[in-house]
Amino acid sequence: MSEIRTLGEFIVAKQHDFPHASGELSSLIGSIKLAAKIVNREINKAGLVDITGASGEENIQGEQQQKLDVYANDKFKSALEARDQVCGVASEEEDEAVAFNKELNKNAKYVVLMDPLDGSSNIDVNVSVGTIFSIYRRISPIGTPATEEDFLQPGHKQVAAGYIIYGSSTMLVYTTGNGVHGFTYDPSLGVFCLSHENMQIPKDGNIYSINEGNYIRFPEGIKQYLKFCQESKPEDNRPYTSRYIGSLVADFHRNLLKGGIYLYPSTQAYPNGKLRLLYECNPMAMLIEEAGGKATDGEQRILDIKPSELHQRVPFFVGSTNMVNKVHAFLDEWRD
């Protein structure tokens, strides 16, 4: 039996990857790990206690907040503030960025952006959900409160990114720019154990993930790509398989392991796309590039986009490199 390596042990062993971090980044990831355990425990009680369903509030995008959205947001925010490595957070569930005002927090080097509970509307039907996080070094002077500019950095400035998937097992997957590593939660020990080291996505795949119910509203290039996916060409391993869970973390995780592409294009209802650049697209783009894949908005690399606002939306195409390139070819051919 191979030796079990916990997330904490792995982070310590990889400390040399952060020559300027002095341990703060490792401790910060430890804060995320702690909050993930708390949220995981609560999710596992869904259906037994009154934590599912709508909270009665809306977020800044006008979307109905679920009770667990609010719960997860509060737990991650509290855990990050308590460790003093973070000067502020921005969340999909918060209208504005939150600057932590304790003196120790003002002296912290990092800001965190997060989607505390992606796919939360799936909770009450027992479908996998997740947490997505992104970490940047602040650009405002240390010793002062965090500013909005600390959060409006292009994705290639991220120092770490990852997600937690709460599914049949709970996994934390993260990168610090030195490979993508996955840790599975052992509830009997209360620790995350290394289960997937140096994860790599296949260059090609035969899975495509998109909400085909919106087909009539898609750009022509996407419609033509979907026809290509469904065409019978055994020599090209087509038709491809359609798999869409409706939870970005779950769809992304499957495609990362098996090879595939996730697509959320612009539509008539969402001409700029629906997914948020800062909370969803940037962290997933960093992960996929570290795993050998590709992420774009249909025109440019996601990680090169300079954000203009906290809740900015973009079209999103992420997955196996050859599949993303094929989507680009269709978009270019059928561009208006």
UniProtKB/Swiss-Prot annotation:
Necessary cofactors: Mg(2+)
GO molecular function terms noted in the UniProt entry: fructose 1,6-bisphosphate 1-phosphatase activity; magnesium ion binding
SUPFAM superfamilies with a match to the protein in the record: Carbohydrate phosphatase
Binding site for Mg(2+) 2: 115, 118, 280
Protein name: Fructose-1,6-bisphosphatase class 1
Subunit structure: Homotetramer.
GO CC terms in record: cytosol
HAMAP family the record matches: FBPase_class1
Manner of cofactor binding, per the entry note: Binds 2 magnesium ions per subunit.
Pathway named in the protein's UniProt entry: Carbohydrate biosynthesis; gluconeogenesis
Coiled-coil zones: none
E.C. designation(s): 3.1.3.11
Gene responsible for this protein: fbp
InterPro entries listed in its UniProt record: FBPase_C_dom, FBPase_class-1, FBPase_N, FBPtase, Fructose_bisphosphatase_AS
Chain residues that bind Mg(2+) 1: 92, 115, 117
Catalytic activity: beta-D-fructose 1,6-bisphosphate + H2O = beta-D-fructose 6-phosphate + phosphate
Organism: Aliivibrio fischeri (strain ATCC 700601 / ES114)
